[in-house]
């Protein structure tokens, strides 16, 4: 009994990856919107998913919104990626996260070196 590995064509992998990225940022902005409503934040930056410079304090409402929306996004995307990719969910989730870090670095014009941002990202990966 030989081990058979099925490799998807590059086009299919790219389509699934693109769908996962669109799904990720859609869920992210929906969870940010819901967080703003729940925490009664009346103004939040459009680039909030890429903001790692917010002061990490439990007294800072914007930080709470960003933290909760990040955790909710990764949890929900973990569930939504399953029907999209069917298998190799971790590969797609990690690839989307790497792209998110790259986009964050590009948008903020510096690499995120804050420990609280990486801790939130690491905990989020466990939720997938």
UniProtKB/Swiss-Prot annotation:
Localization per Swiss-Prot or TrEMBL: Membrane
Domain of life: Eukaryota
InterPro entries in the cross-refs: Integral_membrane_SYS1-rel (IPR019185)
Entry GO terms, CC: membrane
Record carries keyword Secreted: no
Topological relation to the membrane, as annotated: Multi-pass membrane protein
Transmembrane segments: 17-37, 65-85, 93-113
Keywords: Membrane, Transmembrane, Transmembrane helix
Protein name: Putative transmembrane protein 244
Species the sequence originates in: Homo sapiens
């Amino acid at each position: 009994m030989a081990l058979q590995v099925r490799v998807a064509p590059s086009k299919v992998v790219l389509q699934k990856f693109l769908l996962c990225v669109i799904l990720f940022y859609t869920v992210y902005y929906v969870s940010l919107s819901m967080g703003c409503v729940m925490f009664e934040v009346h103004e939040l930056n459009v680039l909030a998913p890429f903001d790692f410079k917010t002061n990490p304090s439990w007294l800072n409402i914007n930080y709470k919104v960003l933290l909760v929306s990040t955790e909710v996004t990764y949890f929900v995307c973990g569930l939504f990626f399953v029907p999209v990719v069917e298998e190799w969910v971790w590969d797609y989730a990690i690839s989307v996260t790497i792209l998110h870090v790259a986009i964050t670095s590009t948008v903020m014009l510096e690499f995120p070196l804050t420990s609280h941002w990486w801790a939130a990202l690491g905990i989020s990966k466990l939720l997938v």
